[in-house]
A protein has these predicted regions:
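Post-HExxH zinc-binding segment in Zn-dependent metallohydrolases
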Residues: 26-67
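C-terminal, non-catalytic "cap/extension" segments appended to globular domains
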Residues: 96, 100-195
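All-alpha helical catalytic cores of prenyl diphosphate-utilizing isoprenoid enzymes
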Residues: 10, 60-81, 85-100, 129-133
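Acidic/His metal-coordination segments adjacent to aromatic residues that form catalytic metal sites
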Residues: 20-25, 29, 78-84, 138-148
Length: 195
């Protein structure tokens, strides 16, 4: 699945299971932006990229093709990509780090607006060895800054850490991997909702 599809799926499950009687009170809100991110990243990184999931996909489409192997190779191969949402698990945190560094420079008044693009390009060349060819794969690829959302990027890294902790602490995750049936996925989602 695309990261967008898994992102929407788990966020909706998370939102729909907030306590409705406390919807407009602090108890009814998400714990934090990082916890919110962790919900989609848990599914994206630990369910939808697991060998178990790709075995299911392989049986749905056509057992004669080795889709499982192709999917696993695609999702578990390090390929440096200039686009954050298409980045592999190795370089994704570096994308977040670069944005965080630039935001710090902006808020310390160490950089002018017109210098952001050059700083972005230099950091991508230095950290990821990518020589960017356009602004759409560079400084203009995210919507956060145009919407005035600053300081959000670290929630992606923290969300990934929380998602890994959820995986580690949820015994139902291992049960699902060993026996991926509808009941076990429902039990896993119920556990996430309750915890």
């Amino acid at each position: 699945p695309s990261s967008a599809a898994s992102d929407v799926y788990k966020r909706q499950v998370y939102e729909q299971n907030r306590p409705i009687q406390y919807l407009y009170e602090p108890l009814g809100q998400s714990r934090s932006l990082s916890v919110h991110e962790s919900q989609s990243l848990f599914f994206e990184n630990h369910i939808f990229k697991s060998q178990t999931y790709f075995k299911i996909i392989n049986t749905i489409f056509d057992n004669s093709q080795d889709l499982e192997k192709s999917f696993l190779e695609h999702y578990h191969t390090v390929r440096i990509n200039p686009i954050r949402v298409s980045a592999d698990e190795f370089s994704y945190p570096i994308h977040v780090f670069i944005r965080y560094q630039i935001e710090k420079e902006i808020f310390k008044n160490k950089i002018k607006f017109k210098e952001i693009k050059d700083l972005w390009n230099k950091k991508f060349l230095h950290h990821l060895e990518i020589d960017l060819i356009s602004d759409s794969e560079g400084v203009l690829q995210d919507i956060h800054w145009y919407e005035g959302i600053f300081g959000y990027f670290p929630t992606y890294a923290l969300g990934a850490m929380i998602a890994s902790q959820i995986k580690y602490n949820c015994s139902l995750f291992d049960i699902f991997l060993k026996n991926p049936n509808e009941e076990n996925i429902k039990n896993l989602v119920t556990w996430l909702n309750n915890n």
